[in-house]
UniProtKB/Swiss-Prot annotation:
Pathway: Cofactor biosynthesis; adenosylcobalamin biosynthesis; cob(II)yrinate a,c-diamide from sirohydrochlorin (anaerobic route): step 6/10. It comes from Thermosynechococcus vestitus (strain NIES-2133 / IAM M-273 / BP-1). The keyword Methyltransferase applies. Its EC number is 2.1.1.195. InterPro entries: CbiD, CbiD_sf. It catalyses: Co-precorrin-5B + S-adenosyl-L-methionine = Co-precorrin-6A + S-adenosyl-L-homocysteine. Belongs to the CbiD family. NCBIfam families: cbiD (TIGR00312). The gene is cbiD. SUPFAM superfamilies: CbiD-like. This is Cobalt-precorrin-5B C(1)-methyltransferase.
Length: 367
């Protein structure tokens, strides 16, 4: 079992506060996770008082998923006394490596993380005192480059998000089983469904007013979920996801975790070549630091060609998904299943829809 980033940030913050109140850093701290309603004890790597007014403590992330990119990343918490007359009791800030919301400028420290920090720090903060807490992720900016955070408005680092303290391993068979169970229940009610790739997919489905009863959340196991949809006799299936994730399917990659396969740059370059872009532009796409940067470059340089490229990618996703189902299901299972896709961009607006995707979207809106 592992924990989410907010839990480790809270452990470091509590340890730093106890440095100030007790004069020494504890080797471990016990936290109330809130969700679930239980306490857990976590180790503290290092900690010390910097002076009488401030302290620093460090933990290391230990999520349950061995492929989680935050595994073993250090989390620092810098805690200092504040004037209790003018300052809030507990002030929480994001330091280096903690992302910020591009739209608001606020640190990407969300509700559960703030509640977890506040609840546990109040247990150790003297009644007459106030503290400021800054969470620092020294590797946060580098790690964020390997995520799609920037595409969804979170820049300069990682988010402290989640709704629970327990990390759900992305590769756990039991989690895939839960997705399959949800798929089975919804397939029994409707033959036209939407695979929403991650939380962003669910949000876009809501924007499109797709009924929740038609939406099935998926993570990285698109291959097994496609096969399951065929076995549950789904007739129409829309893949709704961020283009930087679904593009992998165009190359036949059906487990999309970045640690297992991250050929997005190569795939995009190949489709640019098929669209007839010259060698210099292909080099620019190939050498872009991220796929998002490459797409921005194309948007700027060849805005008239980019829709064609994305349309070809969407069409190829349909082809490869259909071929995957046929390869993994004995006939006649899945032969009548129509797969389409809709890709959205960083602004959560649809940027490309395959022909089958358009048909399925119309079907859903009619019903």
């Amino acid at each position: 079992m592992g924990y989410t980033l907010p839990v480790f940030a809270t452990a470091a913050a509590v340890a730093a506060l106890r440095c100030l109140t007790e004069g020494a850093c504890p080797q471990q701290v016990t936290l109330a996770l809130l969700r679930p309603n239980r306490c857990e004890t976590l180790p503290i790597a290092q900690g010390a008082c910097l002076d009488a007014q401030q302290a620093l403590a460090i933990t290391y992330s230990e999520p349950s998923d061995a492929l989680d990119l935050t595994r073993y990343t250090p989390i620092w918490a810098w805690v200092r006394w504040q004037d209790p007359v003018t300052a809030p009791k507990i002030q929480i800030e994001g330091g280096f490596g903690v992302g910020r919301d591009r739209a608001t400028g606020k640190a990407a420290i969300y509700r559960y993380a703030r509640l977890l920090l506040t609840t546990n720090l109040l247990l150790y903060c003297p009644k007459e005192r106030a503290i400021a807490v800054t969470i620092v992720l020294p590797q946060g900016r580098d790690l964020a480059e390997r995520t799609s955070n920037a595409a969804f408005g979170i820049v300069e680092g990682l988010s402290l998000l989640g709704t629970t303290g327990i990390a759900q391993p992305l590769t756990a068979p039991e989690q895939l089983d839960r997705y399959r169970e949800d798929l089975a229940e919804k397939a029994a009610q409707s033959s036209t469904l939407v695979f929403c790739i991650g939380e962003n997919g669910l949000q876009v489905a809501q924007q499109l007013q797709i009924p929740p009863s038609r939406c099935v959340k998926t993570a990285n196991w698109l291959g097994p979920m496609l096969v399951a949809a065929a076995h549950y006799e789904v007739q129409q299936l829309l893949l709704l996801g961020y283009h930087g994730k679904l593009i992998k399917l165009a190359a036949g990659i059906f487990h999309t975790h970045h640690h297992l396969a991250d050929a997005r740059q190569e795939i995009l370059t190949a489709f640019c070549a098929l669209a007839g872009l010259d060698l210099e532009m292909l080099h620019q796409v190939w050498q872009a630091p991220t796929v998002e940067a490459a797409l921005k470059f194309l948007e700027r340089m060849v805005p008239h060609v980019l829709p064609e490229i994305l349309s070809h990618i969407a069409h190829r996703i349909d082809q490869r998904a259909t071929a995957y189902i046929h390869a993994h299901c004995a006939a006649p299972i899945g032969r009548s299943l129509q797969v389409g896709c809709a890709l959205f961009g960083r602004d959560r607006q649809i940027v490309a829809t395959s022909g089958a995707g358009n048909i399925i979207l119309r079907e859903i809106s009619i019903r």
